[in-house]
């Protein structure tokens, strides 16, 4: 088994999936926080989707992927990872944007800035800590995703969460525990390193809005 191949698959799919989750959730979070679009019903619905067992979506997604040729592809896996992480990212971003001082945006509107310009040049810079924390959490959840990695991939796009389990399969001489342990350590390094590098942003995002000045 090629552990580097599995690591590369997970890295590419997790990065793309995390980026897509942020790109999808950020505008939606702004609309919910500032314009109350769907805040009363859509946000609770999206949050409650996290409680739904993902296995019920496996067969429909598999059949759809089979039709469009996304089975065993990194991009296909990344799409699923993005959709799985959107609820978490949406909740974090919406609560953070709601705590931002609206006076700065109002001043921007007085100067003639539109919604998209405010979103890009005012809201986004003030939300960098939460965006960074959300990206890290989305990356870690994507990296650890096992179910869809097992069902939707066979060889080319197999993630490390699935590939690592192959080393525990008994072969001629039984399980090689030394190799299996080394593989598991390698599999945990990327999210661990990213978490250590970004822990300050995660801490700041968790305390954002706790103190009103």
Which sequence ranges carry the predicted segments?
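A structural signal for multi-pass alpha-helical bundles of membrane permease subunits
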Residues: 1-213
């Amino acid at each position: 088994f090629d552990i580097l191949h599995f690591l590369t698959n997970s890295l590419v799919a997790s990065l793309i999936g995390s980026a897509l989750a942020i790109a999808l959730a950020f505008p939606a979070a702004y609309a919910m926080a500032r314009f109350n679009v769907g805040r009363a019903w859509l946000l609770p619905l999206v949050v409650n989707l996290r409680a739904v067992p993902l296995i019920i979506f496996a067969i429909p997604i598999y059949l759809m992927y089979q039709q469009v040729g996304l089975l065993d592809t990194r991009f296909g896996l990344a799409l699923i990872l993005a959709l799985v992480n959107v609820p978490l990212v949406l909740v974090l971003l919406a609560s953070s944007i709601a705590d931002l001082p609206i006076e700065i945006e109002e001043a921007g509107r007085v100067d003639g800035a539109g919604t998209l310009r405010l979103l890009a040049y005012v809201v986004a810079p003030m939300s960098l800590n939460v965006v960074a924390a959300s990206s890290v959490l989305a990356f870690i959840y994507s990296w650890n995703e096992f179910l869809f990695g097992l069902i939707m991939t066979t060889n080319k796009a197999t993630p490390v969460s699935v590939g690592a389990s192959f080393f525990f399969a008994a072969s001629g001489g039984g399980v090689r525990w030394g190799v299996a342990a080394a593989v598991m350590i390698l599999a945990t390094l990327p999210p661990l390193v990213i978490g250590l590098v970004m822990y300050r942003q995660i801490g700041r995002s968790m305390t954002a809005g706790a103190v009103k000045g």
